[in-house]
From Swiss-Prot:
<keyword id="KW-0238">DNA-binding</keyword>
<keyword id="KW-0132">Cell division</keyword>
<dbReference type="GO" id="GO:0005737">
    <property type="term" value="C:cytoplasm"/>
</dbReference>
<dbReference type="GO" id="GO:0003677">
    <property type="term" value="F:DNA binding"/>
</dbReference>
<dbReference type="GO" id="GO:0006260">
    <property type="term" value="P:DNA replication"/>
</dbReference>
<dbReference type="GO" id="GO:0030261">
    <property type="term" value="P:chromosome condensation"/>
</dbReference>
<keyword id="KW-0159">Chromosome partition</keyword>
<dbReference type="GO" id="GO:0005524">
    <property type="term" value="F:ATP binding"/>
</dbReference>
<comment type="function">
    <text>Plays a central role in chromosome condensation, segregation and cell cycle progression. Functions as a homodimer, which is essential for chromosome partition. Involved in negative DNA supercoiling in vivo, and by this means organize and compact chromosomes. May achieve or facilitate chromosome segregation by condensation DNA from both sides of a centrally located replisome during cell division.</text>
</comment>
<dbReference type="Pfam" id="PF16330">
    <property type="entry name" value="MukB_hinge"/>
</dbReference>
<feature type="binding site">
    <location>
        <begin position="34"/>
        <end position="41"/>
    </location>
    <ligand>
        <name>ATP</name>
    </ligand>
</feature>
<protein>
    <recommendedName>
        <fullName>Chromosome partition protein MukB</fullName>
    </recommendedName>
</protein>
<feature type="coiled-coil region">
    <location>
        <begin position="835"/>
        <end position="915"/>
    </location>
</feature>
<dbReference type="Pfam" id="PF04310">
    <property type="entry name" value="MukB"/>
</dbReference>
<dbReference type="InterPro" id="IPR050308">
    <property type="entry name" value="MukB/SMC"/>
</dbReference>
<comment type="similarity">
    <text>Belongs to the SMC family. MukB subfamily.</text>
</comment>
<keyword id="KW-0131">Cell cycle</keyword>
Length: 1485
């Protein structure tokens, strides 16, 4: 029996508390005992790290973190290490007794992330005497050691003979070696496998029922049926390969299409260019002839245009000179019209201002009188107001003084003083020194009289002044009129000047009245003069155009001559038009006919090509449509005969294939059901027993056993009897022979041998005579010999079938070609040659075109003569009415005479217009000018003196009145009398004051009224004077401007000036129009000459170039033609229908084909290079070389073994036939490869049944497991309902869903997924692909549901869940599940590792104190029965009598922390105790 591998020890180097510690592991249970923080979990973490060094999985948490998804940042590993290099190694001895040290080098990585670097390694072949700590550390002193780095460790190990050190960069490689050496139970190929293994270790470490494992028990317990899956994958791979082959055939067919496309595009590419060059060569020849003809005609036309240019230049120079004169005249006429219009506006202004001045003069006189009267009233009112003010002031002063005197005792003195002051003031004002209070009243009367006298004198002077003002105004008005008319004149000469002006006035009026008749007469004469000048200019132009000098009297005879010439030319032009129309109609008919034939020619040529191909294919000369239809009927008959023969060959081929399939069965069974029956009966096929018989003995044994040679040899027939009941799935005759399959011989028969036959005595009364078969099939050698013959026959039939298929398809293609020809070309194929008709029509068209060109030249000359004659008649029609005007020679003198008379009349009219109103006003005032009223100023001075005298007299009278009024103040008798007098005086003063104030108020109000009125009158007067002065000045300026203008200001003058301006404008416009016309014609002529010169240069250049091209192309074309004929491709390239396409269409066709060819030859370097070279337009022969290269390339690709032609086109057709045959064969092979749904269902069911039995066997090992109230543990396996339905449908109702499994578009997996979705529409498949779902459905594990159950107390069997069990029960149940998983893994992996390897079994259990003694004993028993190692961690030694126990105590010594370890071997009877292990290494620095 193979011994199971064991873990010997665990070594920790430089871990937290362990500098270099090796734990020897017990063969069953190793217990780590110690208090909290002693290092138990660290020791287990080191073991797990060495076992699974995957940082993505490692997460060491304590039990308080159970179920947590995250712990400390370093996942619990960084904090368990010391700074520097750390190691964790496992010393293992496997089933082969090979010692292997596996472990990891760990090192903290500096940084905030608290990362740890891990490097796995293995050491093989290490001697048993050497401990792991000895090679991992180096002694530097008696009690000090140093940890070696990984390179140093490698050097030390490699220095040992026979020891191998291996470092791993991949965890997968590390685990692969561990699996091969039996360290781990399962091959961990991927991270998912490592995750499963880690979850199992983690579940055992922390105890309990792991949900991560129970949820995915199928993945842990059920092995992957790789054989079945591989069978399915191989089957699908074969189908996929078959379909890929079919797809490759389709690709090959597309390549065939590509080759056809290559030939077609190459033909289009080269033929289009070939025909384009042929067309261009013909076109270049025609173009050279056309260019030469155009060159001669252009030279002739250039000479004509040059002559026209000279003539038009001369005429343009004359028109330009005339235009300059007309522009000058027109500008003068426009200026004259502007002056006349300006003068008319000035005259209107003068008349308007004169009327305004007359009105202003009248208003000014009236306003002057009003202002004078207002001035006098103003002076009177001012005097009265001033006197009233003085009187009021005096009375107020007196009253104030009086009031003051009443208030004080000096009132009298004040009044007396005031009286004296009034007296003094009166004396001074009146100049009377002798004035006293007594004679004041007398003097008052005297001065009242003076005042009255001064007032009367003032009134007299005022009346005289008004009369003088009137006389003075009339004289000034008359004098001003004389000055306005005659200029500055002395006042004494004014009357004489005015009388002379009035005497000349009637003569001036008479001259002014003659202005209008003279203007009309002058306008008429000027118009005739201008008409005469225009007629002379027209006559000069006419003579220049006619080239002769004509007199006016000769014009009528010339007109008759030109009219007769026009009539003749008109008839000639009309006849020429009809003839030209007839030739053009004939030419159009020829062009239409040529176009029709040109459109028909490609169709006819294509029909001829198709007819030629049909003639070549059929070998018959097809001369009419009847022969075509007859040969088509012959093709149909030939096709029918060949098809019948091909079908017979196909039937024979299928029969041979059926024989081959039957003979190819394993064990020589002709019926596959015999193999199943042999397995069912526990027997062996007789053919399998004699499978090694030689080919020489095969006939004998075949005859010996006869029909029973397909029987089954069974050990005991009696055991088979019960299986025969109800047996229906078997052959009609089933032979069962009793015997030992291991030592079977033919002694059971009594045999007599004859020549080529045997007689077999079956029973006493029954014999069987059997001849040797001509083709023996008994034994593998005979079958192989027969199969070889059948293979040869099948190949021969296949070749014959292929030949017949080719003939059928060739006949069908020929028939299709005839059908296409009849449908497309039969209607035109036997018509007359359109190209011959086109050549005849082109000859006739050339003749007509030449005649038409000659006719056009002659017609052009006649039309020019006709146009010149019509133009001459038109000019004569304008000149003949002007002949009399041309003969009038006195017209200019009459115009000059009338012009002088009109100037005098206009001068008189201007004088009357300017001074007529003034003379009219002056005539009644002529007598006033005889006397000058110069005394007017003296009267004004006397009037001012009289006003002053009157004002002084009033003031003197007022002063005397005040003295008289104060006369009582001069004497006061006593105070009482003074008071009485003062009282009276007060009343009087107050009364007078009231009267004086009222008088003053009235005077002020009246003064204000008169002042306002006077101001208004003065303002009006000033405004009138200002307006009068302004208008008078403006009138003078306007009159002066009118004189400066110097043109008459009347309506007729404006009309004449406008008419003159319009006539000149019309003449100028006509001249400009003619000049512009000449300039345009000259520009057109110059442009035509330039274009003709450019055309001549271009024609000469093009002619020389095209001639050179024709010469050069001839040599190149000869080389191309020689190359085409030498290689026999002229028939394919010279496609006459392309001759009817223009160069752009052919170039476009060639370019399109070039683009397609670039894609087609992209993967062929040779053709790509040749194609690139052929793109040179200057080397057309390279395109021929490319076409030849394409044909050569396709010829080289022809398989001469299956294709019997050198023509690539025919080879492509034969290739298509061969591809069709391969497609049929592969389609048949795909049908054979397809697996039935029922077979799939049976395979999956068998696998499920096998795994259910295996789970039952695993359950038997767990029935005796007991933890607390849990008496037993088992695993239930059930088939899911939906998947069971799927299996039933696959096995019994597969016919209903053949649309899925017979689809060529779906693989079997996809069809299975579609069926599952069809049976379970309520399920959501998510975003998964049908292929993925189908692959899952091919995995039997997805059909099963696994569930762990426990038998617990009175509850019976219930589902194992942590919530329903105690902690110890859950730990024990979980451990049982893990043991079952490990066993399952070992069984699953048994075939993957060596047969002499039994892997190590080890699990963990942290915090085992939660289990009672009975549960611990159960664990020990389980480990012993299963040969499993277990590492337990507990605060105390839970079972000191069994296994090995380590007591761990963490101590601190000199600021250094280390773990003190004491080992104890169990002391039970069956296992003697070992002395304590106290040796340990002291930690070094």
């Amino acid at each position: 029996m193979i011994e199971r591998g064991k873990f010997r020890s665990l070594t920790l180097v430089n871990w937290n508390g362990f500098f270099a510690r090796t734990f020897d592991l017990d063969e069953l249970v190793t217990t780590l005992s110690g208090g909290n923080g002693a290092g138990k979990s660290t020791t287990m973490a080191a073991f797990v790290t060495a076992l699974i060094p995957d940082l993505t999985l490692l997460h060491f948490r304590n039990t308080t973190e159970a179920g947590a998804t995250s712990g400390s940042r370093d996942k619990g590993l960084h904090g368990k290490l010391r700074a520097g290099v750390c190691y964790s190694t496992l010393d293992v001895v496997n089933s082969r007794h090979q010692r292997v040290v596996v472990g990891v080098r760990l090192q903290q990585v500096a940084g905030r992330d608290r990362k740890v670097d891990i490097k796995p390694f293995t050491i093989q072949g290490l001697p048993t005497a050497i401990q792991p700590t000895e090679i991992l550390t180096e002694l530097v002193a008696e009690r000090q050691a140093r940890v070696l780095s990984l390179p140093e460790l490698k050097e030390r190990v490699e220095a040992m003979e026979g020891v191998q050190f291996k470092q791993f960069n991949s965890i997968t490689d590390y685990h692969s070696l561990m699996f091969d050496l039996g360290v781990i139970p399962k091959r961990l190929r991927s991270s998912a496998d490592r995750s499963k293994f880690y979850r199992l270790i983690e579940a055992s470490l922390y105890g309990g029922i792991s949900s991560a494992i129970t949820r995915s028990l199928r993945d842990y317990l059920l092995p992957e049926n790789s054989g079945v899956r591989k069978a399915f994958q191989d089957m699908e791979a074969a189908l996929r390969e078959n379909r890929m082959t079919l797809e490759a055939i389709r690709v090959t067919q597309s390549d065939r299409d590509l080759f056809k496309h290559l030939i077609s595009e190459a033909t289009s590419y080269v033929a289009a260019d070939y025909m384009r060059h042929a067309n261009e060569r013909r076109i270049h020849l025609d173009s050279a002839l056309v260019l030469r003809r155009d060159l001669f005609s252009s030279r002739k036309q250039l000479v004509t245009e040059q002559y026209r240019h000279v003539e038009m230049s001369r005429e343009l120079a004359e028109q330009s000179g005339a235009e300059s004169d007309l522009e000058t005249d027109y500008q003068a006429a426009s200026d004259h019209l502007n002056l006349v219009q300006t003068a008319m506006r000035q005259q209107e202004k003068i008349e308007r201002y004169q009327s305004d001045l007359e009105e202003l003069t009248y208003r000014l006189e009236e306003q002057s009188e009003v202002v004078s009267e207002a001035s006098e009233q103003q002076a009177d009112n001012e005097a009265r107001a001033e006197a009233a003010e003085l009187e009021v002031d005096e009375l107020k002063s007196q009253l104030a003084d009086y009031q003051q005197a009443l208030d004080v005792q000096q009132t009298r003195a004040i009044q007396y003083q005031q009286a004296l002051q009034a007296l003094e003031r009166a004396r001074a004002l009146c100049q009377l020194p002798e004035l006293t209070a007594d004679n004041a009243e007398e003097w008052l009367e005297t001065f009242h009289a003076k005042e009255q006298e001064a007032t009367e004198s003032l009134l007299q002077l005022e009346q005289k002044l008004s009369v003088a003002d009137a006389a003075h105004s009339q004289f000034e008005q008359a004098y001003q009129l004389v000055v306005n008319i005659a200029g500055e004149v002395s006042r004494s000469e004014a009357w004489q000047t005015a009388r002379e002006l009035l005497r000349d006035w009637p003569s001036q009026q008479h001259l002014a009245e003659r202005v209008q008749p003279l203007r009309m007469r002058l306008s008429e004469l000027e118009q005739r003069l201008r008409a005469q000048q225009d007629a002379e200019r027209l006559l000069q132009e006419f003579c220049k155009r006619q080239g002769n000098a004509y007199q006016p009297e000769e014009l009528e005879a010339l007109q008759r001559e030109l009219e007769s010439q026009v009539e003749e030319l008109s008839l000639s032009v009309s006849d020429a038009g009809e003839r030209r129309m007839a030739m053009r109609q004939e030419l159009e008919q020829l062009k239409l006919k040529i176009q029709e034939l040109t459109a028909r020619a490609p169709v006819w040529l294509a029909a001829q090509d198709a007819l030629s191909q049909l003639s070549e294919q059929s070998g018959e000369a097809l001369e009419d449509s009847r022969q075509v239809t007859e040969y088509m009927q012959q093709l149909l008959e030939r096709e029918r005969e060949t098809t019948v023969e091909r079908d017979e060959i196909a039937a024979s081929k299928r029969a041979i294939e059926a024989q081959i399939e039957r003979l190819s069965q394993p064990s020589g069974a002709e019926d596959a059901r015999l193999i199943a029956l042999a397995e069912r009966f526990g027997g062996v096929l007789l053919s399998e027993i004699y499978d090694d018989v030689t080919i020489d003995d095969a006939p004998y044994f075949s005859a010996l056993y006869g029909p029973s040679r397909h029987g089954i040899v069974v050990p005991d027939l009696s055991l088979v009897r019960e299986h025969l009941q109800g047996l229906d799935d078997c052959p009609e005759d089933l032979y069962l022979i009793e015997g030992d399959p291991q030592s079977f011989d033919d002694s059971v028969f009594a045999v007599e041998e004859h020549e080529k036959a045997v007689v077999v005595k079956i029973a006493d009364r029954q014999w069987r005579y059997s001849r040797y078969p001509e083709v023996p099939l008994f034994g593998r050698a005979a079958r192989e010999n027969r199969l070889e013959t059948l293979y040869q026959e099948r190949d021969r039939l296949a070749e014959r079938y292929a030949t017949l298929s080719f003939d059928v398809q060739k006949t069908q293609r020929t028939h299709q070609a005839f059908s296409r020809f009849i449908g497309s070309h039969l209607a035109v194929a036997f018509d007359a040659d359109p190209e011959a008709e086109i050549r005849l029509l082109n000859t006739r068209r050339g003749e007509i075109e030449r005649a038409l060109n000659a006719h056009e030249d002659q017609n052009q000359q006649q039309r020019q003569q006709f146009d010149q004659a019509k133009e001459g008649i038109s000019a004569l029609n304008r000149l003949i009415p002007l002949v009399s005007l041309l003969l009038d020679e006195t017209l200019a003198d009459r115009v000059e005479e009338i012009t002088e008379e009109l100037a005098e009349a206009q001068e008189a009219a201007r004088y009357i217009q300017q001074h007529g109103v003034s003379l009219t006003k002056l005539e009644p005032l002529l007598s006033v000018l005889q006397s000058d009223p110069q005394q007017h100023e003296q009267l004004q001075e006397s009037y001012v003196l009289a006003q002053n005298s009157q004002r002084l007299a009033k003031q003197q009278a007022f002063a005397l009145t005040e003295v008289v009024q104060r006369r009582a103040h001069f004497s006061y008798t006593d105070s009482a009398g003074m008071l009485t007098e003062n009282s009276d005086l007060n009343d009087k003063l107050r009364q007078r004051l009231e009267q004086a104030e009222a008088e003053r108020t009235r005077a002020r109000e009246q003064l204000r009224q008169y002042q306002s009125q006077f101001t208004q009158y003065s303002q009006v007067l000033a405004s009138l004077k200002s307006s009068y002065d302004a208008k008078r000045d403006m009138l003078k300026e306007l009159s002066q401007e009118l004189v400066d203008i110097g043109v008459p200001a009347d309506a007729n003058a404006e009309a004449r000036a406008r008419a003159r301006r319009d006539e000149l404008h019309a003449a100028l416009s006509t001249n400009r129009s003619r000049r512009n016309q000449l300039e345009k014609q000259l520009t057109f002529c110059e442009a035509e000459m330039d274009s003709l010169q450019k055309k001549l240069r271009k024609l000469e250049r093009d002619y020389h170039q095209i001639r050179e091209q024709v010469v050069n192309a001839k040599a190149g074309w000869c080389a191309v033609m020689r190359m085409v004929k030498d290689n026999g491709v002229e028939r394919r390239l010279h496609r006459r229908e392309l001759a009817y396409m223009d160069g752009d269409e052919l170039r476009s066709m060639s370019d399109k084909a070039l683009g397609a060819l670039r894609l087609a030859v992209a993967d062929n370097e040779h053709l790509r290079d040749v194609l690139r070279l052929s793109e040179d337009p200057k080397r057309p022969e390279r395109k021929i070389q490319f076409y030849i290269a394409v044909y050569q390339h396709l010829r080289e690709r022809i398989r001469q073994d299956i294709i019997r032609t050198d023509d690539p086109v025919e080879a492509i057709e034969q290739m298509e036939i061969e591809l069709g045959r391969l497609t049929e064969e592969l389609t048949a092979r795909e049908q054979k490869l397809a697996i039935s749904s029922k077979s799939v269902s049976n395979i999956i069911r068998k696998t499920i049944h096998r795994e259910q039995n295996r789970i039952r066997m695993l359950n038997q090992g767990l029935q005796a497991v007991s933890f607390g109230q849990v008496k037993s543990v088992r695993l239930n396996v059930n088939v899911r309902e939906a998947h069971a339905t799927l299996l039933d449908v696959l096995s019994e109702q597969q016919e209903q869903h053949q649309d899925l499994f017979n689809s060529n578009r779906l693989t079997f997996s996809e069809a299975l997924a579609k069926l599952y979705q069809r049976l379970n529409p309520q399920m959501d498949m998510g975003q998964r692909l049908p292929q993925t779902i189908g692959e899952e459905l091919l995995d039997y594990r997805n059909y099963l549901e696994l569930e762990v159950e426990v038998y617990r107390g009175a509850d019976g069997w219930l589902r194992a869940e942590s919530g329903a069990l105690s902690t110890g029960e859950a730990i024990g149940t979980g451990m049982s599940i893990l043991v079952m998983v490990v066993q399952s893994w070992e069984e699953e992996s048994r075939r993957l590792r060596g047969k002499d390897i039994s892997p190590c079994r080890l699990l963990f259990l942290d915090e085992a104190a939660r289990l009672d003694a009975k549960s611990i004993a159960t664990l020990f028993e389980l480990c012993e029965r299963l040969e499993m190692q277990l590492i337990i961690a507990a605060p105390e030694n839970i079972s000191p009598e069994k296994g090995t126990t380590y007591k761990l105590v963490r101590k601190v010594f000199q600021n250094h922390e280390h773990v003190h370890v004491v080992g104890l071997r169990g002391f039970a009877n069956e296992m003697p105790s070992l002395p304590p292990i106290a040796a340990e290494l002291q930690q070094g620095g």
